[in-house]
Amino acid sequence: INGEWIKSESNELIDVINPATEEVIGQVTAGTKEDIDKAVSAALEAFSTFQQTTKEQRIELLNNIISEYENRYDDFVQIITKEMGAPIWLSEAAQAKTGIKNIHETLDALKDYEFERPEGDYTLIKEPIGVIGMITPWNWPMNQITTKVSAALAAGCTMVLKPSEISPYCAMLLAEVFDKAGVPNGVFNVVNGYGPTVGAALSEHPDVAMMSFTGSTRAGIAVAPVSYTHLTLPTTL
């Protein structure tokens, strides 16, 4: 949160299990509504300046992220193998590779993207929407995370990500990559935890301008109605 690893308001821990061996490979804290409040506050504060960055600055930032991702590529492969129980070859050739591929594709799209263009007698200007809440699943984590996150960065948005509590470590590793790449504090925030607590708190937060969700039907049914109570809150499922 805001560029720092911080102690959660909760003392509850979640075991992260390698499904191939059924061994506990580590633990993460089950976050709280208070943790989400801190993360959204940091993202909202960062948005005031990050939204003003130029396309060229965001292109440079994505290039830096790609470079740092490549430096940690083997770490992504190893952690995905452990938290998903995936074979090494699959983690390397598909899981980790898809993550960096998504960032490359976003970068290519950004280079040619027109945020401002004439439309007849008018000028159409596309502006970043604000703080985006993101919820991602366990089974293809880097694909889902990088698809959402890289697009938000390219648009000039800030974000709070709740990764799956089943496979949270690749998101935490990505946070290290972003920090090393120079992503400004507060632009990318990660809060681990369960959907009914952390996910719900994120989707109903008044300062979240948009929700992007990929996951189970159960979780989608829970998130969508809460988001739609904010009548102007776009929600993509």
What name fits each language-model region?
Residues 1-120:
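N-terminal Rossmann-like NAD(P)+-binding subdomain of aldehyde/semialdehyde dehydrogenases
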Residues 115-231:
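Rossmann-like NAD(P) dinucleotide-binding subdomain of oxidoreductase/dehydrogenase enzymes
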